[in-house]
Structures are given as C-alpha cells and as structure tokens.
C-alpha cells in the first residue's frame, strides 16, 4: 500500500523491533524543538535516512495529534540515562565496560565522551535491528578504547561468554525500552544471566533500565494502543515494586529510582500545569505505578 500512513518502505522491522522507531522519532522531534531536552542531533539524521528508505513515520504517531508531551517524556528519560552513564564513568575513570542492550538506533555511544584506555562500549540488539543500524548509522570515531556492535541472543545463557565480554573491569549494563516487551520470566532470567556472569569472576557492576508500572501497562495496552497495535505488539510486563527482583536474582541489590515524576517536570518541557500534576503524582507515591528508571548493583 505505497504512500499510505502504514507504508514501511524497505524497512523490515516488525513487532517490538519496530517500536524503536517511535522513540527515535521522538528524540528527533526533541532535537528540532526550540528548547530541546536531549538535543540528539544524530537522531534527526537517522530519521531522514530511514525516510529515504520509504518508511512513513506516521506509523509512530497514530494516537497523538500533538506529540509534544510524549516527545519530552522520551527525551527526558534518555537524558537521565545519559547522566547515569556519565556518573558511572566518573566513578570508574580507568578501564570499564558499558553494555547497551536493545540499543536500536540510539546514538548514546556517539553523544557521550566515553573513550579512554581500557574502555569498551558494546551496542547490542537483534539481528534485523543491527543490520539496519549498520546501513544508516555511523560508529564512534576510532579513539582510545574499543567499540563493538553486536547481535547476541540475550536469552542464551552463554552469550556474554561467547561474545568475550571482559570480566576484569567494572561494568554498566543499561537498556531502555526493552523490558515492556519481555515476560516476567525473561526479565528475571536476563538479570540472573548478567549478574552471575560478572559476580562469578569477582566483578562489581551496575544495571540500569526503565520499566512501566501497572498504570502505564494498562494505558498503553488498552487506551493509547494504536501505534503498538499497528506494529503487532503490546506491553507484556510491568513492575510496581523494584525490590521484588532482589528475591529472584541472587546478588542483585536495588539502589535507586533513577528518575521520579518530578525529574520529568524539572528536566522536561511540559508547561506549568503538566509539571504540577507530575509532582502531585509523586507526592501521592504513585510514580512507580506509572513507570520509572531503576538502578541495581551486584
């Protein structure tokens, strides 16, 4: 159906993989705004290149005539995770590894100054995503340190070993927009896999990710569901209590909510009324049921 709002052109991503284009488009819209939160100029370039392949980004905004709120939400989340990466590198100025799972078309490895002696950055995602990324995105310029772009099966118990991920330096594992499309058992197994791989070698590390709460789970699946439904997917997991994972993953310790709703109000561009309502939601302690970012250590 060439030229229709559902046209994908040459882009073959489907299901949860295609949803990465929703957040990519939001980051690009933020970069084009008068007062950007993230100001990810790379995303605008990537959107243009994907459009050249015939993809119609109307697929990502079917439910939003005015997407400014969602744009600010996505940009703020990305900015907070960028800050977490920067703080990890400040705490570990020597050799260190950063593993970005479900990297999609995110330019974090380009946005941040992570290179240094003994530094390793791994961007990882599914095979079809990595294939598209190689076609349309540049890799970080060669400097001190190492960059890898990989397509492991993160549900395979041996993937960290098979991809020769170092176990002799501090590690940060982060993923953004991944957990909503996993089952509870898959989330627990992934965290166990990561924790065991590094703890068995005596390596300390951090895991940071975002997760929807029960309120967001309901709203996305049953109210604002047109974009995901058109892509053939839905949310399959939510988390209201971040300490629950400690009981299922030995050695994993919950440390913090990385961003609460008033962080969105402080960093984002929502206007005074929306900002006030976000703060009120936190005062009544319902932020976790909406969704947040979480920091763990092992």
Swiss-Prot record:
GO terms for biological process: methylation; terpenoid biosynthetic process. One of its GO terms (molecular function) is methyltransferase activity. Diterpenoid pyrones display various biological activities and FDDP E shows anti-HIV activity. FDDP D and FDDP E show also inhibitory activity of 42-mer-amyloid beta aggregation that is involved in the pathogenesis of Alzheimer's disease. InterPro entries: Ppm1/Ppm2/Tcmp (IPR007213), SAM-dependent_MTases_sf (IPR029063), TcmP-like (IPR016874). SUPFAM superfamilies: S-adenosyl-L-methionine-dependent methyltransferases. Its EC number is 2.1.1.-. Gene3D superfamilies: Vaccinia Virus protein VP39 (3.40.50.150). Pathway: Secondary metabolite biosynthesis; terpenoid biosynthesis. Keywords: Methyltransferase, S-adenosyl-L-methionine, Transferase. It is an enzyme of class 2 (transferase). Belongs to the methyltransferase superfamily. PANTHER family: S-ADENOSYL-L-METHIONINE-DEPENDENT METHYLTRANSFERASE YKTD-RELATED (PTHR43619), S-ADENOSYL-L-METHIONINE-DEPENDENT METHYLTRANSFERASES SUPERFAMILY PROTEIN (PTHR43619:SF2). S-adenosyl-L-methionine-dependent methyltransferase; part of the gene cluster that mediates the biosynthesis of diterpenoid pyrones. The first step of the pathway is the synthesis of the alpha-pyrone moiety by the polyketide synthase dpfgA via condensation of one acetyl-CoA starter unit with 3 malonyl-CoA units and 2 methylations. The alpha-pyrone is then combined with geranylgeranyl pyrophosphate (GGPP) formed by the GGPP synthase dpfgD through the action of the prenyltransferase dpfgC to yield a linear alpha-pyrone diterpenoid. This is S-adenosyl-L-methionine-dependent methyltransferase dpfgK.
